[in-house]
């Protein structure tokens, strides 16, 4: 994907900017897998024709097959040892790919509060709402009865997550510019349209290095 950040306001310790970009269709949308003999015979009996190779479910296709616009708006307020902000955005699936469907659009609202413990360490809390729309259309080579992920009726959901994170910025001469972060997130509410696997807690660890 490619994106550009445009500053809209930067006064009185308040920053507002927008990100505008495009999600590019580099991932595959036609990945397949070979069936075992038992599954092969079962499908042959039900479908009436041979399926030695089966198209993977929608969630296992890493690409979208389309060029999709994405946009977000972010506002951050800075205080002495505290900052808070919110971001609203989305990835808009407006077009149909060559397999006959468009992937789910993704909309979100992310709000956070961050406090500096000292010049290197900060702690933050987040609240994230995500809305995933249903897949529009259908890939005729994906067999719905094989798994819930293969049925477009199960592709939509809404999710509310809460999280807490620690960030550490190194300031010594050797590791200057290196930032380490660890975040724990837990689902607060989850609404599924259809059948989906249960969502559990998750931990994310990341590193960022800035060249000055």
Regions found by a protein language model. Name each.
Residues 1-98, 149, 212:
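Outer-membrane pore/translocation modules
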Residues 103-212:
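Outer membrane beta-barrel transmembrane domains
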């Amino acid at each position: 994907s490619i994106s550009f950040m445009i500053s809209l306001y930067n006064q009185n310790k308040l920053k507002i900017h927008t990100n505008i970009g495009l999600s590019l269709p580099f991932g595959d949308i036609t990945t397949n897998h070979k069936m075992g003999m038992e599954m092969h015979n079962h499908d042959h009996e039900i479908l009436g024709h041979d399926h030695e190779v089966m198209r993977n479910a929608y969630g296992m296709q890493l690409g979208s097959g389309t060029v999709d616009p994405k946009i977000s708006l972010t506002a951050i307020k800075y205080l002495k040892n505290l900052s808070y902000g919110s971001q609203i955005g989305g990835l808009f699936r407006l077009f149909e790919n060559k397999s006959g469907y468009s992937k789910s659009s993704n909309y979100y609202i992310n709000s956070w509060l961050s406090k500096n413990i000292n010049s290197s360490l900060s702690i933050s809390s987040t609240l994230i709402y995500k809305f995933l729309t249903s897949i529009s259309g259908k890939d005729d080579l994906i067999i719905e009865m094989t798994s819930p992920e293969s049925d477009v009726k199960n592709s939509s959901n809404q999710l509310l997550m809460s999280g807490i994170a620690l960030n550490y910025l190194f300031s010594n001469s050797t590791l200057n510019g290196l930032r380490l972060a660890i975040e724990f997130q837990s689902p607060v509410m989850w609404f599924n349209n259809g059948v989906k696997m249960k969502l559990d807690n998750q931990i994310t660890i990341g590193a960022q290095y800035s060249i000055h």
